[in-house]
Design a protein with these regions (language model features):
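FAD-site-proximal beta/loop scaffold in flavoenzymes
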Residues: 24-41, 124-200
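Glycine/serine-rich phosphate-binding loop and adjoining beta1-alpha1 elements at the start
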Residues: 1-27, 43
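A short alpha-helix-loop-beta-strand transition element characteristic
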Residues: 13-15, 150-151, 200-212, 236-241
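Flexible, glycine-rich terminal cap/loop adjacent to redox cofactors
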Residues: 198, 216-227, 232-322
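Short loop/edge segments at beta-strand edges and connector loops
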Residues: 10, 30-32, 101-103, 109, ...
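Short hydrophobic core segments
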Residues: 2-11, 46-47, 67, 124-134, ...
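Short glycine-rich anion-binding loops that position phosphate/pyrophosphate groups of nucleotides
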Residues: 12-14, 134-137, 245
């Protein structure tokens, strides 16, 4: 195949850790396989405490499975504001999900109708085990070793700021280039390549705007920018405010008082440094904050913005009244 422009967009595939018995187990599935189950597992084990694992843990718990999350990390959601992460964990536990942190899996043993996960903290028996231990760039079958296309130490296709590989005219977009693994980032990768091919190339990885993330549990948990600790570690002037959903009118209308909003700002420049929203509509409202950050809108402006009532968005008035 020959072309002036070639774009590689092969995505990512689940990472299978070298745990004895995992790859061979007929009761262990990845994030694709768990969507193809014909029967609801009575006991579901989830290996990994990242977004994929937690979203499926929440889903299957809601459907009626007894869910246990085995997480090798010592801290639950370590990249989330600690106070918000603690709330999220407590709600999921109240809903019936069991969490075990700092668990190291040693072996998977299949039985007749179930499997046993052997760990350093005991053995656990499940009907189905979801292994959600990360995803890696999907370069298998591309035969890159027969080309001049370079890959990183982590197995991603190496790209420059325009997402062009080491071979001119060949671009890599989406998960395969080692960037943030979100569908909307793959779409933004397209914008970068399109701008380079048809414009002036001014929009690239170095000029890319802020982007938010959302963990789709109940309630949803969304975040953009820096956490309080990250901002302090950078030596920035920091002011913070945390607002419980229980203090929000719409929370009472929704009859759901779970969650909290937290903002991190620079009191000297009036910039928004980051925000974490945990509550109904968080995945929607976080985009308003992201746009404000991209356009350097001071947090003092949002504190005085007129919002409709009663909405969750109107609580940005109080959140940014710092």
């Amino acid at each position: 195949m020959t072309a002036e422009t070639i774009i590689i967009n092969t995505g990512a595939v689940p990472t299978i850790l070298p745990i004895p018995g995992l790859a061979e187990s007929k009761f262990a599935v990845d994030s694709t396989g768990i969507q193809r189950l014909e029967n609801l597992p009575k006991r579901l084990g989830v290996l990994g405490g990242g977004p994929i694992g937690l979203e499926f843990a929440h889903l299957y718990n809601t459907l009626g499975s007894q869910v246990t999350v085995l997480d090798a990390a010592d801290t639950f959601l370590p990249r989330i504001e600690p106070s918000i992460a603690a709330l999220a964990k407590s709600y999921l536990e109240e809903d019936g999900i069991q969490f075990l942190q700092g668990v190291h899996t040693q072996e998977i043993k299949d039985g007749q109708n179930s499997l046993t996960v052997v760990t350093d903290k005991g053995d656990f028996e499940f009907d189905i085990l979801l292994y959600a231990t990360g995803r890696k760039p999907n370069i298998a079958g591309l035969d890159l070793e027969n080309t001049d296309i370079q890959v990183t130490d982590r197995g991603a296709i190496k790209v420059n700021r325009h997402l062009e590989t080491s071979v001119p005219g060949v671009f890599a977009v989406g998960d395969v280039n080692g960037g943030p693994q979100f569908t909307y980032m793959s779409l933004d990768d397209f914008r970068i390549v399109f701008n380079y091919l048809t414009g002036d190339g001014s929009y690239n990885l170095e000029t890319r705007n802020n982007y938010a993330t959302t963990l789709f549990i109940a309630p949803p948990l969304a975040q953009v920018g820096l956490t309080e600790q990250e901002a302090r570690d950078k030596g920035l002037p920091v002011a913070v405010k945390e607002l419980p959903v229980a203090a929000m009118p719409r929370g009472h209308v929704n009859a759901d008082l779970r969650g909290a909003f937290k903002a991190v700002v620079n009191p000297e420049t009036k910039e928004i440094l980051g925000a974490t929203l945990f509550g109904e509509a968080a995945g929607e409202i976080i985009n308003l904050i992201t746009m404000a950050m991209d356009n350097k809108i001071p947090y003092t402006y949002i504190a005085k913005q007129i919002f409709t009532h009663p909405t969750m968005a109107e609580n940005l008035n109080d959140l940014f009244a710092i």
